[in-house]
Amino acid sequence: MRFLQALAATFLLFFCMYFLEGTVQISDRFMRFEIELFKAAELALMRIAIDLYTLLPIIVGLAALAMSFLWFRSSEMVAVRSAGISALAAMCVPALCAFLFGIVSIALLNPLVAILTDQFRISAGKIDASLVQSEWIRNGEVVLGRPGQKSESVIRATLVDETKFEFQDADIFLFADDGTLTHWILAETAMLEDSRWQLSNGKIWRIDSDSPNPEKSAVEFEEYELPTDLTRDQVNSSLISLNFVSFWEIEKLIELRERAGISSVEFKVFYSAELAKPLLFAALVLVGAGFTTRPARVGPASIKVLLAALTVLGIYYFSTFTKVLAENERISPFAAAWLPPTVALALALTQLLVVEDG
């Protein structure tokens, strides 16, 4: 119970700091749109969800540190050990609570964060259209120009309707087999349909040695169909950001991206890290206990708290570092996810066993 109280207090502290900061930043960012304070607070609430979720390991570690320090100051741990209960056994319940909280975070909080983050993107985009990012899509093989001539194309456009796969301000670049640019298509709107892009209100420039002046041979159109081998599933999987994906959808998305020939390393790393999160939370609780339950003769309490806090931060940044290595394919996603909690658990058990030895 003490751990849950410390966890709630620590989370509330971080929430208040990030909420106030986010409200001020959003009010300043959308000042020219004369946004109301209530609307700024609503956007801040949606925006900070991903930040707080990312910082959960630090929040859990600091909560465990606060709980253990209170035990140390009130001599509760001394009484527990005098009753014949080891420090390791006394920390089993808080560690189990942290483990269960890790399960709840990936099962319930993760989908909620994905919904709030996506809602922030939509709401902010309605206020300021410049916040809507352009997307780059590799279009596969298309036929354009001379019969039998195939080109590789890349599309840059702004997604405006996810359900209809409708884009605005589309720039389409077509390349020959040797990588040289052959055509440039500019369209006001582009909609992905069955085996084709339906383009509207645009212009086609032919760029090759046969047309030294592309503007002279340029052709304007109201409607144009550009063949493609892309499917809506492939485009959807390539556009999705991890911030908008629920934990329960990641496996399906990984399979979809691999079938479409799109790299899914980042998604595999995230999925493995989420699976390892309960163990990481439990290990961080034991790390906090390992420093603060040592006898008073070992050193001042302030030094113990500082060392414990630095250790928690070190484990967090080590976890981030291993994820970066995995995303760059230096180590496997499994190693990146499970190495930090394993190291943290080994360190915590070492500390607690030293305490038991006296």
Go through the PLM ranges and name each one.
Residues 197-198, 338:
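Signature tryptophan residues that serve as conserved aromatic anchors
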